[in-house]
């Protein structure tokens, strides 16, 4: 989710007494004809399973293979990963089937438009472009002060704070990451990050591109590639090629004359190299806490990010089961700014083009014409910003190759794009600030024009409110963010640091939640409230938890061990309350794969995704130690579990939670024969086991 951090950096970006939260939050707006306020009965305990509390913890930007490449399951279980496929050996070196993951070079040049699966060739010299370093040279905490670290973040166990002040790269600038052994001569496939003595599990690492059209192209989907085990034909062969030809977008700028896909001191590069191909090795002690949880609880090896691309779009799909679109802010579709001046008369004035165009620019190989998070704003001239697509119109850039591919599948897939709707494919700031003010119409110089108008698309929050099931979104550092809407205290390490993730809160886009002060206060709170609710036993039925940018595990700006620590604190606190623990399920996942390679099957569901596999671990008394579920699932499967458990209807008639549970064959449990289909995650539990 690089865009979150880029945007935020630029921005400088209880229950009480005898009244339950459910009664408080659900009584709002409900009344009898005589004006008396009703108190609807809570349905929190009206469940289909013994689970009365669901906690969803969402980290940042890791694929399944990136973490669990070498995981060996407990006896009686099987797993699909780089090791089991023979792509690598237990020591992380290439295995006998390494060619299955071989990465390729390709060509997409004018007059060709965007190619979903361009003609490929071997990488030069049959080696990867050198992965480039990322993260701080030292640490993000001044003078590596433990005291400052503890003031800045309250979401870690005491023994994890040392990780906040260690792990710097020791490198300066975008150069090959020499901490990686053999960095300039890596074979053309997955490689272990921690393959030497200088790149440890605690090291900050680089972050690869993770945008919509880039990920579609990296997956290299074509039915001519299809096999019995991979009927979608997505062979994931173009990860480094996309990284090095376009990276995280162009914002409409011309390709520099000194541009190169290979590093040299005089060249202009995308700043990534083959970062996408790195993985950790749990057999060598990497990711120890998540391995412990996988060994002692349950895990899926077929869970996916729901949208190709980045953080904002995936959190939106998680919260709504659907994508959101550009509007007039009143529920009517509209056309986003397209080569026009915006914010006229302000410091942010500039010509922007918010419509995606992944067609290669003249005289380039795959340098997208218009694609980016947006340049300038925050007090500077605005430009670029291609992040919307009208995918109902096949004449729009990038649309025809994807819709043609979807139609070519054995079970043709509908794009699910409504006419005249420009869907948000990448990260833009949400339409509301934390204080409930309209962020789209705000003209303060510290704001950004790359903000989506308030949305009317229904969410799981609306669904739960309507059905009298309590819920909260707990955002780490929310209390610091609300009085700091432009996040001027982002990176201000200390008590006021504001690394709350605004684009991660799916409800911050929505008028139904953010436009009502009472509803907003009841449902959007800080993780400080999470810890107190756990301790007091007043947790709502559904809790969604997002760490701050310091501890979310995002590559470059955070580390996986910090997200492990954030997760461990919550798990430990819940287990300290036996009354709560006995009927709780904690879902631990990522918002997306962050652009890292993964070898798992990807099922096309619509125009928006799915994307790569990501981890999903479920911690509950009702899981069997070491169980691995293979049923195909994605973020929206968590909504399906909530809906099935509390008897709640789907979010809307078009949301993905309407898809059936997958049906698969015994010899290929990963591929639904009734596509499009996603699981409700019930197979992760053994309710007769407890």
Descriptions of predicted regions:
Residues 1-12:
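N-terminal secretory signal peptides that target proteins for export/translocation
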Residues 13-29:
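Bacterial N-terminal signal peptides
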